[in-house]
Swiss-Prot record:
Gynoecium. This is Transcription factor HEC3. Required for the female reproductive tract development and fertility. The gene is HEC3. Residues 125-174 form the bHLH domain. Residues 68-77 have a biased composition (Low complexity). SUPFAM superfamilies: HLH, helix-loop-helix DNA-binding domain. The keyword Transcription applies. Keywords: Developmental protein, DNA-binding, Nucleus, Transcription, Transcription regulation. Residues 22-42, 68-88, 183-224 are annotated as: Disordered. Residues 194-204 have a biased composition (Polar residues). Residues 28-37 have a biased composition (Basic and acidic residues). Residues 78-88 have a biased composition (Acidic residues).
Length: 224
């Protein structure tokens, strides 16, 4: 009977030692895992390995989105520039072309004093220097706009935005007319010369004046 009885103190010591050993092993594993987590270089290397080696769809296999967008934007910008350079000439109607030709024969010397100014409303005018300078600048712009309205065919009956569009078309028409006239006549103006070269050319072309003798002098026959 005594052989089958176990000492309680021995059983308790055995159990307690097993618990301590298992706890120590767990602590060692936790310490190793904690040290690995506290190492940022090791964590970064692990993430890089997982992303760039084991992930076939990583960013190394595909170009970045920003570079693709930049390339697309540059290509589209070049295409827009080519379209602007190759813009076809706008065809004008017969009525508008005749109106442009009539306007081109009118005088372009417009006195700003003859242009009617709009009526100013009764508002208080500030004496601040910045306000005065801004008001003068707006008045100069308005004066140039009114003169341009007189130069553009039908510009006095349009608002400012429509008149500016019409001015662009009118300038293009005038440039085409100048190009056509130059092609038809075939005349190319000579390059401008400075005054010194022009004086040298004139002296070589025109002969010197003949000598003049007074009353008491002898004639050319007597000299011979």
């Amino acid at each position: 009977m005594n052989n089958y009885n176990m000492n309680p103190s021995l059983f308790q010591n055995y159990t307690w030692n097993n618990i301590i050993n298992s706890s120590n092993n767990n602590n060692k594993n936790d310490d190793h895992h904690h040290q690995h987590n506290n190492d940022p270089i090791g964590m970064a290397m692990d993430q890089y390995t997982q992303l760039h080696i084991f992930n076939p769809f990583s960013s190394s296999h595909f170009p970045p989105l920003s570079s693709s967008l930049t390339t697309t934007t540059l290509l589209s910008g070049d295409q827009e520039d080519d379209e602007d350079e190759e813009e076809p000439l706008e065809e004008l109607g017969a009525m508008k072309e005749m109106m442009y030709k009539i306007a081109a024969m009118q005088s372009v010397d417009i006195d700003p004093a003859t242009v009617k100014k709009p009526k100013r409303r009764n508002v208080r005018i500030s004496d601040d220097p910045q306000s005065v300078a801004a008001r003068h600048r707006r008045e100069r712009i308005s004066e140039r706009i009114r003169i341009l309205q007189r130069l553009v065919p039908g510009g006095t009956k349009m608002d400012t935005a429509s008149m500016l569009d019409e001015a662009i078309r009118y300038v293009k028409f005038l440039k085409r007319q100048i190009r056509l006239l130059n092609n038809n006549t075939g005349y190319t103006p000579p390059p401008p010369q400075d005054q010194a070269s022009q004086a040298v050319t004139t002296s070589w072309v025109s002969p010197p004046p003949p000598p003049s003798f007074g009353r008491g002098g002898r004639g050319v026959g007597e000299l011979i």
